[in-house]
Regions:
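Conserved beta-strand signature within the Rossmann-like core of class I S-adenosyl-L-methionine
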Residues: 188-193, 215-222
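Conserved SAM-binding loop
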Residues: 129-130
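Conserved alpha-helix/loop element of class I SAM-dependent methyltransferases that forms part
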Residues: 70-89
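N-terminal auxiliary segments of SAM/dcSAM-dependent transferases
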Residues: 1-44
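Conserved SAM/SAH-binding beta-strand->alpha-helix loop
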Residues: 122
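Mobile active-site "lid"/loop adjacent to the S-adenosyl-L-methionine
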Residues: 163-207
């Protein structure tokens, strides 16, 4: 994959300073300004398909490609081998939302006996992908401009790939849990339908599934690591008869210096009844950390750093198991849309704790000695004031 990315002009950076210095050398200020204007229009209230397509057309400008896509260098290193290892005996592969074709052409090179068809709504991306495929002398890949939200793709396929394409509504928080104490979500059909429609997931999935041949598979990798997005996404897949063929795989990679916890990677199919792996709607398993209050006693503390903190789903279990837990003050705030935020300040033996939870699955617990209880008291006040 490294050689392939090099041919595309991409470079690997681990320093933001070095990356942005190179970006300034290779991209004109005028081009960056035009791109930023496209981003602003795409993110503006009321923006839709036209603004999103215009943004992706802009990112397919040849002078921008090396700098822009080098930010995703480690994303390609993480995803390409995982998908490549699962292509197997598939002979007709559809790459939905292929963009400029970096991954599509890599897979076509690796599997010359198979036909790869890349589709995308951005005409500029498709034009560039087609030119690159010709330059790479690939005769087993083709690219077509198709907006799957509105148009069908002809033919049937043994394998459908969708990486960062099915659920592009990154700003959509998903569906909240029933209460701040729980990670569970009830089976509200109206909320599920609304999620699928406002994110565009329903029409995309429905059209893609018409192209799956018998015993064919889907490999899907979307930004659904947060449970509030993962649960409705999985429910949409399950409602259409898709089952897991292997356990989902969360993936971590770097966007230069920023760490991205992404995915999971799903391998899906329509196996015979009774086979496949059951869906899980619980939080990701984390190390079952425990708090030994006795071990924290007498530990030196300084400044505003707590003696202990946990920001994972395990914080709820730790909070529930605190010995001699006594609440000093608490509040639960509920919005008009039903979202809840709970914060609680209390004591556990001779330590002070702060616990925060909301219906978007965020959990946080902090412990500090009584002498510095004011640190958590101030934090509690900030949360309460909103």
């Amino acid at each position: 994959m490294v050689a392939h990315l090099t041919e595309w002009g991409l470079r690997h950076f681990t320093s933001d300073t070095a990356y942005f210095a190179w970006q300034r050398q290779t991209v004109s200020a005028a081009d960056l300004n035009r791109l930023h204007a496209c981003i602003a229009r795409k993110q503006a209230p009321g923006a839709g398909t036209a603004e999103e397509t215009a943004f992706y057309d802009a990112t397919a400008e040849p002078s921008l490609i090396p700098a822009l896509y080098s930010q995703r260098y480690e994303y390609y290193l993480a995803i390409a081998p995982r998908v490549d290892a699962r292509i197997g005996s598939a002979r007709r592969i559809l790459d939905f939302g292929c963009g400029i074709g970096i991954l599509t052409t890599f897979f076509a090179r690796r599997h010359p006996e198979s036909l790869f068809v890349g589709v995308d709504r951005s005409s500029a991306s498709i034009d560039y992908a087609s030119r690159r495929a010709a330059e790479l002398r690939l005769d087993n890949v083709e690219f077509h401009r198709i907006d799957v939200d509105r148009e069908a793709v002809s033919g049937s396929y043994d394998l459908v790939l969708a990486t960062h394409a099915l659920l592009q509504a990154e700003q959509d928080p998903g569906i909240p849990s029933d209460r701040w104490e729980s990670f569970a979500r009830g089976g509200d059909v109206a909320r599920q339908t609304a999620f699928e429609l406002r994110t565009g997931l329903a029409p995309r999935l429905d059209r893609l599934l018409t192209m799956l041949a018998d015993q064919s598979r889907m490999i899907v990798f979307e930004k659904t690591r947060l449970l509030a997005r993962r649960v409705p996404f999985q429910r949409a897949l399950a409602a259409r008869g898709l089952r897991l063929l292997e356990p989902p795989e969360p993936v971590r990679y770097a966007l230069v210096e920023e760490v991205a916890d992404d995915g999971p990677l799903y391998v899906l199919g329509r196996p015979v009844q009774g086979s496949g792996i059951d869906w899980s709607e619980g939080p990701e398993e984390v190390d079952a950390d425990t708090v030994n209050v006795d071990s924290l006693r007498g530990r030196p503390g300084s400044g505003e750093d707590p003696l202990y903190e946990n920001h994972t789903a395990a914080a709820q279990m730790l909070w529930q198991s605190l010995p001699d837990r006594r609440v000093m003050k608490e509040f639960t705030r509920e919005g008009q849309d039903g979202r809840q935020l709970h914060a609680e300040l209390g004591t556990t033996q001779d330590l002070v704790y702060l616990y925060v939870a909301n219906t978007f699955d965020q959990r946080q617990i902090l412990l500090i000695e009584e002498a510095r209880a004011g640190v958590l008291d101030c934090y509690f006040a900030e949360i309460e004031q909103g």
